C-alpha cells in the first residue's frame, strides 16, 4: 500500500497488523525516598516481570483509535487520557508522521492494581508501531520514548528482573536463571498511585513505615535462585500506605500466608497482592485456597521472570491484505 500527504514523496505503508505481548510487574523490593521539589519520589526497586500479560494489536487506520477488552476494560479511558494513546502520538511525533493506527488491548493485567498494566500497554504500542511501520528504531530510542511516558514504561520494555533507580526508569539487569512461582490476588477495589504516595508521605511524617535495608541481599537471593532465601527479604515501603487506604488487604495477605505461601507482599502501590511459593504445585494449592477464602476478587498463578514487550505476530507481507 502506498500513501502520500500531497506534498511529500509517496512512501511505503505496510499493511496488516502487529500483536505484542507484554507482562505485568511486581516489585520484589521498593524503597521510597522523600518527596522531591518536582513532586516525585526517588525510588530504589527490584522489578520482576511475571507471566500475566496483556496483548496489544496495532493496525494502520485512517485515524487514531483505541479499544479494550478483558480485565477491567470498562474502567479504562479510550482517548488521550490513556497512556497507550499517548504512546502512539509520541511515536508518530518522533518519526514525523500522523498517529493513524487502531489499537486493541486485550487485558489480563489488573487496572490500577500496582502491576503497571497501563505502562505495559504503552510499551507494547511503541514496540508494535516500530514493527508495523518498519521503523527499525534501536532499543535506546524506544527506551528514551518510554521514559518520557512514565516511570514504569521502560521496565515493560526491558522485562526479566531489574534494579530500578531514579523514578524507576533507570534500569540495571539482574541476572537470575531461576523460575519463581507466584500467586496474584486481585482486590475488589483499586488504588490510585498518587493517593497511595500521599498517604505514604503522611505516614512517613509520623515515622511509619521504617525504611528498608539496602537491596543487596535481595539481589543475592535472586542470583542464588532460592525462593526460601528470597522470601523474608521481600519488602515494599508503600505497603503500609496501601493497607491504610484498603484495610481488606490485611485479610488477603494473612490468608495467603495461612494457605502456605513463603511470603506475601503488596505489589507496587497496590492493591494486588503477590505471594511467593516454593514450587509450581505449591502455587496451585495456595491459589486454590486463596480463591476459596473470599478475601479477593480473582486469583491468578504466574511465573517470573519473563521477557518484556515482544512481537508475537509480525506484519503480513507487503501486498497482502487482511482477510
Swiss-Prot record:
It is an enzyme of class 2 (transferase). The active site is at 25, 152. ATP binds at residues 110-120. The keyword ATP-binding applies. Pfam families: GHMP_kinases_C, GHMP_kinases_N. One of its GO terms (biological process) is isopentenyl diphosphate biosynthetic process, methylerythritol 4-phosphate pathway. Gene3D superfamilies: 3.30.230.10, GHMP kinase, C-terminal domain. It catalyses: 4-CDP-2-C-methyl-D-erythritol + ATP = 4-CDP-2-C-methyl-D-erythritol 2-phosphate + ADP + H(+). Keywords: ATP-binding, Isoprene biosynthesis, Kinase, Nucleotide-binding, Transferase. Its EC number is 2.7.1.148. Pathway: Isoprenoid biosynthesis; isopentenyl diphosphate biosynthesis via DXP pathway; isopentenyl diphosphate from 1-deoxy-D-xylulose 5-phosphate: step 3/6. One of its GO terms (molecular function) is ATP binding. Catalyzes the phosphorylation of the position 2 hydroxy group of 4-diphosphocytidyl-2C-methyl-D-erythritol. Belongs to the GHMP kinase family. IspE subfamily. This is 4-diphosphocytidyl-2-C-methyl-D-erythritol kinase.
Amino acid at each position: 500500500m502506498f500513501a502520500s500527504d500531497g506534498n511529500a514523496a509517496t512512501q511505503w505503508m505496510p499493511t496488516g497488523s502487529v500483536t505484542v505481548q507484554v507482562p505485568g510487574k511486581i516489585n520484589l523490593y521498593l524503597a521510597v525516598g522523600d518527596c522531591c521539589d518536582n513532586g516525585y519520589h526517588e525510588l530504589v526497586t527490584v522489578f520482576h516481570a511475571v507471566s500475566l500479560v496483556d496483548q496489544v494489536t496495532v493496525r494502520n487506520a485512517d485515524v487514531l483509535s483505541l479499544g479494550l477488552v478483558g480485565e477491567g476494560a470498562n474502567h479504562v479511558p479510550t482517548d488521550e487520557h490513556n497512556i497507550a494513546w499517548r504512546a502512539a502520538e509520541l511515536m508518530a511525533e518522533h518519526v514525523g508522521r500522523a498517529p493513524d493506527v487502531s489499537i486493541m488491548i486485550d487485558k489480563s493485567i489488573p487496572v490500577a492494581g500496582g502491576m503497571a498494566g497501563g505502562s505495559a500497554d504503552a510499551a507494547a504500542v511503541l514496540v508494535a508501531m516500530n514493527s508495523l511501520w518498519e521503523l527499525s528504531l534501536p532499543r535506546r530510542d524506544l527506551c528514551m520514548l518510554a521514559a518520557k511516558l512514565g516511570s514504569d514504561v521502560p521496565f515493560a520494555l526491558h522485562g526479566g528482573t531489574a534494579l530500578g533507580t531514579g523514578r524507576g526508569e533507570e534500569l540495571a539487569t539482574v541476572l537470575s536463571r531461576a523460575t519463581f512461582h507466584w500467586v496474584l490476588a486481585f482486590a475488589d477495589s483499586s488504588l490510585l498511585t498518587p493517593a497511595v504516595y500521599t498517604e505514604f508521605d503522611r505516614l512517613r511524617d509520623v515515622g511509619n513505615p521504617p525504611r528498608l535495608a539496602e537491596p543487596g541481599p535481595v539481589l543475592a537471593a535472586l542470583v542464588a535462585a532460592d525462593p526460601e532465601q528470597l522470601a523474608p527479604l521481600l519488602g515494599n515501603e508503600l505497603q503500609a500506605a496501601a493497607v491504610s487506604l484498603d484495610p481488606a488487604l490485611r485479610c488477603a495477605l494473612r490468608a495467603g500466608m495461612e494457605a502456605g505461601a513463603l511470603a506475601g507482599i503488596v505489589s507496587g502501590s497496590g492493591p494486588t497482592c503477590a505471594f511467593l511459593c516454593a514450587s509450581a504445585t505449591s502455587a496451585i494449592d495456595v491459589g486454590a485456597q486463596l480463591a476459596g477464602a473470599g478475601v479477593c476478587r480473582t486469583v491468578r498463578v504466574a511465573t517470573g521472570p519473563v521477557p518484556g514487550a515482544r512481537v508475537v505476530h509480525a506484519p503480513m507481507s507487503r501486498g497482502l491484505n487482511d482477510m
